[in-house]
Amino acid sequence: MPLNPAARAQPAPRRPLIVRLRNWVGDVTLAVPTLRRLDDAGYALQLIGKGWARELLAGHGWPVHPLPKTMGERIALLRRLKAEAQAVDAQFNRRLNTLCLPDSFSSALEFRLAGLRALGHAHEGRSLLLARALPLPRTVHALQVYWQMADVLLGATAPLPAAIGLLVSDAHRAQAQALCARHGIVPGSLYICPFAGGTWAQQDKTWPDFPAFAAQVLPRHGRRVVVCPGPGEEAVAQEHFGSATVLNDVDLGTYAALLQEAALMVANDTGPGHMAAAVGTPLVSVLGPSDPALWRAWGPAVQLVQGAAGWPTADSVSLAVQRALTTD
């Protein structure tokens, strides 16, 4: 007797996988290809990360749970997600069921105390806490580090992707269009991100010539210059980049939608630069002390501009901008 066509067409059940994201926008952006690969392989992702991660990843439709502040609250969340996964997957406790992208001791400890079987890197004495501990690569780009974790989880290798492919939700695209309409911003504008969180080898990652470049060089291209400061960056944007259109309080999903319509972004080593590359927008990445081999923005339209012994000149950045706009 032939099988019922409806029964034959039923897809295989998706396997729950809990994923702890890292804490920086650039790191989460570089993990997107790995998350997409796991999603395509049949995993039902349950992501845990900073509050902004939900907006950043909204276009992919993955559940993103805000990372609680205390260890007790984080363990309680993990136990709840574990119980929900067990209810739909009888094999959940018999396999690697958690991906730990951070390398901190506390993240591995929380998974262990929640009774989860985590895959992560051997670092800071975490090996005994993880169900499987991998050597931590020291000279490999972050995107490749995450990609290799998926190799282990899936039991198969795959070529590295040429592009990240960050998706933008329809809601964020509509918000971006409304914002542009209010401020008279048209497609093909130039976006800058002159901010940079943290340091590299105790050195500032902010290009010192950025204010003069934004005020004197970029306007020569006849396009609107736009800056979207993050929390705590508003005063710096107004004081040093007041000649640009300043958009405050823009969430990361809307920011990504704005960048999709940009002609170009010029950025320091910072999260929005990674976002621009991730949505396919040409990026001029201005680097000083950062090591591009480990953390550069990833994509076919990325130009790295770095001095031989420090920051690049304004002329070299200007040439990169001209190349990008000519190609566009």
Regions found by a protein language model. Name each.
Residues M1-D328:
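Catalytic machinery of carbohydrate-active enzymes
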